Amino acid sequence: MSRKIAFAASDMPVAQTARTALAARFGDVPEDEAEVIVVLGGDGFMLHTMHRTQALNTPVYGMNRGTVGFLMNEYSETDLPDRLAVAEEEVINPLRMNAQSRNGTVHEALAINEVSLLRAGPQAAKLRISIDGHLRLEELVCDGALVSTPAGSTAYNYSAHGPILPIGSDVLALTAVAAFRPRRWRGALVPKTATVRFDVIEPEKRPVMADADSRWVESVLWLDVRSETRIAHRLLFDPGHGLEERLLREQFS
């Protein structure tokens, strides 16, 4: 028996056309009644949908109708129920960010890929880094820094020369962005259970902004990041094309 499907599509015409065709063929129920949510778009829309539907605990299966499709399966209109029946599930825990801005407001957000700090002015940022309350780096002079999940390690983290992490690994990637001093410091692997804290040095002279999956906070004074294990995103992939295989392919491409 086919599973009840809810379709979610980005605003791109190709995604909307695909939704119309698939809904006519397989039906389309409200998301809170669905047994699986099929996402049509690219990785950006997939992340948006995962955040939006996280309280439903419904597995999500993406088909690429966008530009970047690392989290997506190949698009096909003909065999969707069969693909869903044999799809393999990956579970991803997001990061939780708390960041205080100069006006005293503490902002909270979740990130599936990474939380990043970036300079917001012409001068390099100066950051102090602590892990679980222990000072680890007195001063990092850089364009920024980020903390990445294994699922996000092939995105901005990899572009910043951070390591690709196996899915399911109990570590997070802490990666510097264009580090000037210490010159040779690129980052570190930290336990998934750790809380990473950044304190901004000279925040008025060297303003810094934070980003959690495109949720921006300006004029940051401090920021902490930890894995949110109470939230689990369930992603479905075609057999042999899960995140582990994609991570391997990325390293040899």
Predicted regions: what is each one?
Residues A109, L117, P122, D132-R136, ...:
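ATP/nucleoside-binding phosphotransfer catalytic cores, i.e., glycine-rich phosphate-binding loops
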Residues V68-G144:
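Catalytic core of DAGKc-family lipid kinases
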Residues M1-L40, M46-A55, Y75-V91, A99-A109:
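ATP/NTP phosphate-donor binding region
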Residues N57-P59:
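Proline-centered loop/turn at the N-terminus of a beta-strand
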Residues T17, H48-M50, L71-M72, N157-S159, ...:
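Short glycine-/acidic-enriched loop or helix-start segments at secondary-structure transitions
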Residues G42-F45, G66-V68, A151-T154:
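Short glycine-rich anion-binding loops that position phosphate/pyrophosphate groups of nucleotides
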Residues E139-R183:
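Gly/Ser/Thr-rich active-site loops/lids in small-molecule metabolic enzymes
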